Amino acid sequence: MKKKRSLCAALLAGLIVTAVCLTGCGQKAAGNGSSGVDSDKVYQVGVCQLTQHDALDAATQGFVDALNTILGSEHVNIDVQVASGDSTTCTPIVNSFVNKKVDLIMANATPALQAAYNATTSIPILGTSVTEYGVALGLSDFSGTVGGNISGTSDLAPLTEQADMILDLVPQVKTVGLLYCSAEPNSEYQVKVVEDYLSNKGITCTRYSFSDSNDVAAVTTKAAADSDVIYIPTDNTAASRTETIGSIVRSAKTPVVAGEQGICAGCGIATLSISYYDLGYKTGEMAAQILKGEADISQMPIEYANASKLYNADMCQELGITVPEGYTALEG
């Protein structure tokens, strides 16, 4: 599959990159840790994570744990860099990995994937916490396998089922506010699917978009005042501002149905969400196969995780929401 490469990949001077040191805590059961790896081999892996919030942190931890478990921690050096929520910072991060000639790059979130996509055609790249790869990479003929040097995992949960949760939890709903960051293409994609589905059921949907975190409070206040229910997709900007959003929707008594459990825990009543730790772990398993020469990344389809119906017990009680059967309370 041919790729449209960006002509502009200039490094931005003076950018501060946050390095995160992750340990192997929370690992799944380990095997012998180094099956199929030469005794003196140490793989170099670079991780570019867009920002720090529960979902992305869990995905990176799962990825690290999988590689340490499968390859053995003595056989892999993982350099985790966080772009502090600035998508432009992803470019110098991945360029540094390319210059170091790492064996594999893991891109956690869409802007990180886009930066890696534009940086190299030879180093294997695995994405995670990416909703729709065709949208993220501008691939009009995407059908499940990106090809070339890119594959990964998707955090996409069934969007029509998420939309149905709004009807299950707030059956009297007439207006839904779609709250998201307009700078995140995967958020735009999710909003369109949910908007079309609910509109066909006679629900009035209105988009409330913010361009960055500075606009979140004002836009959320407007959405909460105008809407019976707010829907927030898997959106990194929203995920980093759940405390702000939660304060506003509590005051307005406006329930939020979220695209992932981190947002739900911070400001929502319910979500149909995957485990980001498991998603990252699956990505790490794919990475181990590639590094050991057991799989050709160009032939590896995008993989998905199973989704579960979860609810925020405290928020539901506060807003008087009756939760139907089939939902599990969020832990913590």
Locations of the language-model features?
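Short beta-strand elements in bilobed, periplasmic/extracellular small-molecule ligand-binding domains
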Residues: V64, T69-C90, N149, E195-S213
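Hinge/cleft segment of the Venus flytrap/periplasmic-binding protein
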Residues: Q289-G332
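Pocket-lining segment of extracytoplasmic ligand-binding domains
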Residues: P185-T254, E260
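Extracytoplasmic "Venus flytrap"
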Residues: G33, S39-V64, D79-T89, A183, ...
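Hydrophobic alpha-helical segments within soluble ligand-binding/sensing domains
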Residues: V37-D38, Y133-T175, I274-A295
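Beta-alpha junction/loop-to-helix N-cap segments that form part of ligand/metal-binding clefts
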Residues: D79-D141, D235-G259
